[in-house]
Amino acid sequence: MKISQIWTTGYAAGMNKMVDYLTHYYFRDKEPFMSLSALADHEAIKIMEALCDDTPFGTRFKDPLQYLRNRRATETWVREGFAAKGGQPQAPYPISMVLGSSKWMVAIAPDRDRHAEIRIPLSIFSETDISFTVPDSMISRWFSLEKPPEFYQPELHGQIFTLSEILAIVDQKGMPELDWQTNLPSDLAPYIEAQVWRHDLLKVYKKGNDYGSG
């Protein structure tokens, strides 16, 4: 089922906080839709060592090997959870994006001059192409394992959501950075993460395409 069909059924027909796009954030001088998960360990570690700093963006890379292990374990968890709900992940790893947009992502950009973004319409995806977590998938999995009492919400954390499920949550609660009462520390991502499992659908939105690029 594509989003155009979802809008005409059930909850979505009366949705008043409609969000109909994803945002991919990347460095302007780099190719979009790239992933550390596509690289050999030594290549990924080299990149993380170069990006490591004390900002919310770079601090996660202070132990690059452990980060890579956690990332791959998280991607496997999301992939298996999505498949269990009927998803059809066609790639071994997802391209991560944000549902709607994120002021937090813009604010933590380590180099504003290199910051760029591409908006992808949700209408190109079906239910079997894309999964979601609240918030970032690594944080969601971490919360579900550690269950920190000040942050853990079992109905949201440790859950893999389909397109229709996440839109139902947005219809009920609004968008996290605008409408939710959250006590997440400022260094943790507050957005809804989207995991795109069909990379071929993104080719038309690469550099040189005028749609939604920033």
Regions picked out by a protein language model, each given a short descriptive name:
Residues F57-I95, L99:
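Short, intrinsically disordered low-complexity segments
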